[in-house]
């Protein structure tokens, strides 16, 4: 998925062609106003366009369009190392996992490199919520670097429109008991001149809302029992003299 990544997309494509010479590199341009598409074509990528704005919309179309044994998804901002591609893909191709997750947190590189306020806090909050609801602890739930099997991709109903997609992928994997493997990867911040499209506050609220929606859909008994308990406590409190 790409939106205005002309500064970095050429290097990203070259790096992944080098590490995975037999792979087809797709770039889904999400209404870029710069030269992202032209540069991607010049570097040998297959370029497609998604007019509906938002990373979730892009992923929905990608998963519909592409047939592959292994799907490696990465952002076009050159923050994820192509050198980790085989470590992510091999467990999928060897039948050991259905989704591998590029973990930026365990080795400390995300904390060192990321300069945007509250991103680490938001990641930890979402991890804690997923662990409490679903009982599974991800090392890095918000990473955009993942590999997935064909059965996983083709049975995943994408509901998200935007940056909630990583959270939705994670919850879907846990709820449907897909095999998950965390793979530590090095993280590097965006190069000078490259701008993040993520809005910490508004996108963070959307992620939390998505967790609530999926909690209701995937764990309705637990969700409505919790709501009933809250109302019961409030009712008792209001009824006490």
What is each residue range found by the language model?
Residues 5-18:
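Short, well-formed alpha-helical segments that are part of the catalytic scaffolds
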Residues 5-8, 32, 55, 81:
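Donor nucleotide-sugar binding loop of glycosyltransferases
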Residues 21, 43-44:
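Short, structured coil segments at secondary-structure junctions
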Residues 29-37:
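A conserved acidic beta->alpha catalytic loop
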Residues 51-65, 70, 82-163, 190-205:
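Acceptor/aglycone-binding surface of glycosyltransferases and processive sugar-polymer synthases
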Residues 158-241:
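Hydrophobic helical membrane-anchoring modules
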């Amino acid at each position: 998925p790409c939106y205005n990544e002309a500064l970095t997309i050429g290097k990203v494509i070259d790096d992944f062609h080098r590490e995975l010479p037999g792979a087809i590199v797709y770039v889904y341009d999400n209404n870029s106003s710069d030269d992202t598409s032209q540069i991607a074509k010049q570097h040998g990528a297959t370029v497609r366009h998604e007019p509906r704005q938002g990373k979730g919309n892009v992923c929905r179309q990608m998963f519909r369009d592409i047939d592959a044994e292994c799907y490696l998804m990465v952002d076009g901002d050159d923050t994820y190392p192509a050198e980790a591609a085989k470590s992510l893909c091999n467990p999928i191709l060897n039948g050991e996992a259905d989704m591998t997750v590029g973990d930026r947190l365990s080795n400390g590189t995300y904390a060192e490199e990321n300069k945007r306020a509250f991103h680490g806090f938001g990641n930890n909050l979402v991890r804690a919520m997923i662990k409490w609801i679903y009982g599974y602890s991800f090392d890095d739930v918000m990473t955009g670097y993942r590999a997935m099997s064909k059965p996983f991709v083709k049975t995943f109903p994408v509901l998200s429109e935007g940056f909630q997609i990583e959270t939705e992928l994670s919850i879907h994997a846990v709820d449907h008991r897909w095999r998950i493997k965390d793979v530590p990867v090095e993280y590097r911040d965006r190069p000078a001149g490259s701008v993040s499209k993520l809005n910490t506050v508004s996108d963070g609220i959307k992620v939390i809302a998505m967790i609530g929606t999926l909690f209701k859909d995937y764990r309705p008994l637990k969700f409505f029992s919790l709501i009933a308990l809250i109302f019961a406590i409030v009712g008792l409190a209001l009824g006490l003299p």
